[in-house]
Amino acid sequence: MNRRAAARPGRAVIALDLGGTKLAAAYFTGDGRPRAKRVVALRERQGPAVGALMGLEIRRLRRAIAGSGLSVEAIGAAVPGIAHADSGHVWAPNIRGWDDYPLRRELETAAGGTAASLAIDSDRAACVLGEAWRGAARGCRNVVFLAVGTGIGAGILADGRVLRGAHDSAGAAGWLALSRPFQTEYSACGDFEYHASGEGLARAATRLLSQTAGYRGPLNRRRALSAKDVFAAYEAGDVLAARVMRDAIEYWGAACANLVSLLNPEKIVVGGGVFGPAARFLDAIAAEARRWGQPVAMGQVTFEASRLGGDAALYGAAVLARQAKRAVGGR
């Protein structure tokens, strides 16, 4: 990954990272640092209102770039769900009204003809690009970024290129089949995600609470549990939370073993909203993976927590922009 991938001197790229609840936006210059960064909550926005917000942020950053005496070279946007490269449309199940949203058209309008190129890709693809550029996978050409948050996804870099698949949906790691027998609940989000995402941890804790008579620990004090509650209870030495985390480590380890055996990466980078507090379990996850994975490949891979944290996709969006510029003849 070219460490000077963000922008040439005197020019800047605009980077957008859209999540299910917020939008982060910044511009990058040749030094690879985000400038004029802002994070805006989506609040009640849905459908075209979310696209309009992205357009507003592009216009804001265009003004900031011009005020710094620079010019806009390209725009990159990371989005949840599936970004269709051919049409520029996006399917994002966590944004209402984005079943087939024409995002490229919205962003081209906001660019006002100033950007020579525009790239839209999945947040999982952006995360692995960001980590390979400025994060935990610098210098690596074969990397898997496993994102564990509300859901689960994987960004895959194979021989220096993002693996997107025939129809742009590669990396839907939440659908890894790790359990038997099949349960109908898996149809909504996938087996792995059902059990080991942030929502999965909360679901597992709630189920154990209902099965544990006489429990008086910290998890009994809340009506609706979250992964944050589970981590806090684990830190307090709660036995029930320890059971939840033990099971989660088994799922995360088995999934990593499958990814390593199939793809033979140099590095597995684990990130996402859950993996702030869960980074402490990385050694246990790697040990579990080694029980299951192909032994030669497992001996060649290293495991590391994200170094960019919540900014991984934003950095990756800058890389996407620069790649798009090169694709249309830029240097």
Roles of regions detected by a PLM:
Residues N2-R4, R8-A12, A26-T29, A36-V39, ...:
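Glycine/GP-enriched mid-protein hinge/lid loop-to-helix segment characteristic of carbohydrate kinases
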Residues G47-P48, A52-G55, R59, R63, ...:
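Glycine-rich phosphate-binding loop and adjoining helix at the ATP-binding site
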Residues V260-V269:
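Proline-aspartate-enriched helix->loop->beta-strand connector
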Residues I249, E266-K267, A279:
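Helical "lid/coupling" subdomains associated with nucleotide-phosphate turnover
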Residues I75-G81, V270-P277, S306:
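Glycine-rich beta-strand-to-loop/alpha-helix junction loops that act as flexible
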Residues N2, R8-V79, R104:
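Conserved phosphate-binding loops in N-terminal lobes of ATP-dependent enzymes
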